[in-house]
């Protein structure tokens, strides 16, 4: 399988879910580069080490301190292949604008994003990751970047 760069982000009330998901999928994740927001990454790394799994995990800042924005910038630069973002939909987040920015950039730049464990499981088990004949279709909105704007 080709080596992917996978972003893992989880709100405080979903961090336990993320750690459980990462441990459940540790074998898969150990073959890929993982980029996380700070606290999530440290928790995932510790849990994997306790299970004896070596993983390539890079931690950005904590989400409220700009980690979501750092990962969104990586999406724009085409450095992220897949994002798993376990969102706490039951409580307001002080950095809601950053959260929406990350979700929006994934949609705009055609990066698959899973917002629950089931969709994350479906995405990581997709055979399309290794299908060299499959080329994701760019969203039609991307064509707007090629428009010639009128000049004065």
Model-derived segments and their meaning:
Residues 12-20:
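Glycine-rich phosphate/diphosphate-binding loop of Rossmann-like nucleotide-binding domains
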Residues 32-44:
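Short internal beta-strands
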Residues 35-37, 59-61, 85, 113-117:
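General beta-strand structural signal in soluble alpha/beta enzymes
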Residues 45-47, 118-131:
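Glycine-rich, charge-decorated loop segments at or immediately adjacent to ligand/cofactor-binding or catalytic sites
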Residues 46-70:
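Active-site rim loops that border cofactor/substrate pockets in soluble metabolic enzymes
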Residues 68-100:
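Mid-chain, well-packed structural core segment of small domains
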Residues 87, 102-105, 111:
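C-terminal binding/interaction regions
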Residues 145-151:
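Conserved small/polar residues in nucleotide/adenosyl-binding loops
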């Amino acid at each position: 399988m080709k080596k992917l760069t996978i972003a893992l982000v989880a709100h405080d009330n979903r961090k336990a879910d993320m750690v459980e998901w990462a441990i459940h999928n540790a074998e898969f994740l150990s073959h890929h580069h993982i980029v996380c927001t700070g606290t999530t990454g440290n928790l995932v790394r510790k849990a994997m080490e306790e299970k004896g799994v070596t993983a390539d995990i890079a931690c950005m800042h904590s989400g409220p301190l700009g980690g979501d924005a750092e990962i969104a910038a990586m999406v724009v630069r085409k450095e992220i292949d897949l994002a798993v973002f376990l969102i706490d939909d039951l409580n307001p987040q002080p950095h809601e604008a950053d959260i929406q920015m990350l979700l929006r950039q994934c949609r705009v730049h055609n990066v698959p994003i899973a917002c629950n464990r089931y969709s994350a499981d479906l995405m990581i088990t997709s055979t399309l990751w290794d299908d060299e004949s499959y080329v994701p279709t760019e969203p039609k909105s991307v064509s707007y970047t090629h428009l010639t704007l009128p000049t004065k």
